[in-house]
């Protein structure tokens, strides 16, 4: 059986958004689905300063890639180098509207501050404030990596 079935090299078993935010390998290994491309397009449309439709709820079974798509979209919003999205960019290039949205976003002066909220025994408000503080510390000290 092992001769017929094997795990692809580089296959990642899990994604932790806070820990993997700077991981190039996670971005390179993301395999986009039609629904992932649709979500990316929706989010790119929602970052327009005039947009009021910004909230999203992502529901799916364990292991379906929710964290991986969020990590990938967040990395695009952070304007990471597009060459890191090895498997994603060919699919995006097949969709002229999505490709143009990404090009326009990368050429814009829009900036996104990632605030990754981790579960804790504090209130949601406290968890948000702590995560916001850590994100602000991270951007003010570019040589320091803060894992939330």
What are these regions (language model features)?
Residues 1-64, 70-77, 89-94, 114:
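Walker A/P-loop-proximal flanking segment of P-loop NTPase domains
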Residues 56-57, 83-90, 101-120:
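Conserved catalytic segments around the Walker B and adjacent sensor/switch elements
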Residues 57, 68, 123, 127:
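Charged, alpha-helix-enriched surfaces in structured cytosolic catalytic cores
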Residues 96-99:
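Short, mixed-charge aromatic SLiMs
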